[in-house]
């Protein structure tokens, strides 16, 4: 890999380790403040709603001022939010901390735009596969550390996440080279840009697919801790180890399989296969009460997420021009945040009122519908020419 790729990979990896520490812990931590499943869903949703507001703005700013300063700002906001979480004395402070993180949460969107700047049509899927591998590694190391530190206290993993995110911020400040120049920066409302991009036929359906996938994924991600706690009596430590194992499977899929599969099937068919695999994993989990079977169902789940994430991101990136990657990724990030706002409330609400199996089953059905929509999407490289006009 080139130096910019190495640094952006390490920056995002370290940041995602911090994020991976928080995810399995947050539901258990929130319950110590008296949070119900619905309140936990709203806690996850508050982050995504704040990100929904901020993501297009940060994407536009990254086009105007450069990727690196926006990435540093986002990482700094994450550090502040983790400190607030660790020092919280009430559920209200937990909500405030997640909102702060969401408003400054442009790190992944900016990283996608950064990779879009340096990618070519030939290596785009492979480079986004590496970003996916960073996700996978982050979700091996992060949840594993969360499980280890949870033996000490619920706040110990949060302090560890804050320290790790400081390391990511320092990497971005001192070693990450810039990819765009502050030229031809037009002051366009990010929401106007979102409407304009959504008006393109090649992006409108793709944005809908993107939204539905991330809403379904948010159901899985934000209900997993309560799912395994209710069905298999897991605690925060065991949930962290479970997510670490799932992350390990994801690394294998995204680092070793995505490139060859995309080369053979193309991005669209890889995405369709991923949606079906994920539906099998989540739908099967909804039906089983056997822990060994649940473990086996992690395999199609990991294949699904491993195929979907890089192929979907690559399709979105390929549908926008090189000079507008910040706007495209910011708009996509806004819709993904909308999905991650609705998904936790949907998933945790259904879990509280109808049971954890119904929550997972509903997400699996939406994934199958999304696969059907994906079959109607026509990949067109003319979008680059359209964007240049």
Task: Give the label of every model feature segment.
Residues 97-136:
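Cytoplasmic helix-loop-helix junction between adjacent transmembrane helices
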Residues 107-119, 307-320:
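Intracellular juxtamembrane helix-capping segments at the cytosolic ends
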Residues 69-84, 269-284:
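Structural signature of the two symmetry-related core transmembrane helices
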Residues 34, 66, 87-92, 233, ...:
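Helix-breaking motifs and short loop linkers at transmembrane-helix boundaries and internal kinks
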Residues 24-37, 222-238:
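Short amphipathic helix-loop junctions that connect adjacent transmembrane helices
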Residues 55-66, 253-267, 351:
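Helix-to-loop junctions at the C-terminal end of transmembrane segments
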Residues 131-173:
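Helix-loop-helix hairpin linking two adjacent transmembrane segments in secondary transporters
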Residues 177-209:
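Juxtamembrane intracellular "pre-TM" segments in multi-pass secondary transporters
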């Amino acid at each position: 890999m080139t130096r910019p790729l190495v640094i952006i990979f390490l920056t995002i990896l370290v940041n995602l380790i911090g994020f991976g520490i928080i995810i399995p812990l947050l539901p258990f931590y929130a319950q110590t403040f008296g949070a119900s499943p619905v309140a936990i869903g709203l806690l996850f949703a508050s982050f995504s709603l704040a990100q929904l507001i901020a993501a297009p703005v940060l994407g536009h700013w990254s086009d105007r001022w450069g990727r690196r300063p926006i990435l540093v700002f986002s990482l700094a906001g994450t550090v502040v939010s983790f400190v607030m979480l660790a020092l919280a004395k009430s559920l209200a402070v937990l909500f405030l901390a997640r909102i702060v993180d969401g408003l400054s949460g442009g790190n992944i969107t900016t990283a996608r735009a950064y990779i879009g700047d340096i990618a070519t049509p030939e290596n785009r899927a492979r480079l986004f596969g590496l970003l996916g591998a960073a996700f996978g590694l982050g979700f091996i190391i992060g949840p594993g550390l969360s499980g280890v530190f949870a033996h000490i206290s619920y706040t110990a993993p949060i302090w560890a996440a804050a320290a790790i995110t400081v390391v990511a911020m320092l990497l971005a400040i001192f070693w990450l080279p810039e990819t765009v120049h502050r030229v031809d920066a037009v002051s366009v409302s990010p929401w106007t840009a979102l409407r304009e991009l959504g008006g393109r036929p090649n992006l409108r359906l793709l944005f809908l697919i993107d939204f539905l996938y991330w809403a379904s994924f948010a159901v899985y991600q934000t209900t997993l801790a309560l799912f395994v706690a209710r069905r298999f009596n897991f605690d925060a430590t065991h949930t962290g180890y479970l997510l670490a194992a799932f992350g390990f499977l994801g690394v294998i899929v995204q680092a070793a399989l995505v490139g060859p599969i995309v080369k053979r099937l193309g991005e669209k068919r890889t995405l369709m296969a991923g949606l079906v695999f994920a539906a099998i994993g989540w739908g099967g989990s909804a039906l089983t009460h056997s822990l060994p079977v649940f473990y086996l169902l992690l395999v199609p789940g990991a294949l699904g997420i491993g195929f979907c994430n890089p192929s979907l991101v690559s399709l979105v990136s390929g549908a926008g021009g090189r000079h507008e990657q910040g706007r495209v990724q910011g708009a996509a990030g806004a819709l993904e945040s909308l999905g991650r706002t609705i998904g936790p409330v949907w998933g945790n609400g259904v879990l509280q009122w109808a049971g954890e199996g119904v929550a997972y089953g509903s997400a699996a059905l939406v994934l199958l519908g999304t696969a059907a929509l994906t079959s109607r999407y026509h990949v067109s490289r003319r979008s680059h020419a359209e964007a240049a006009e």
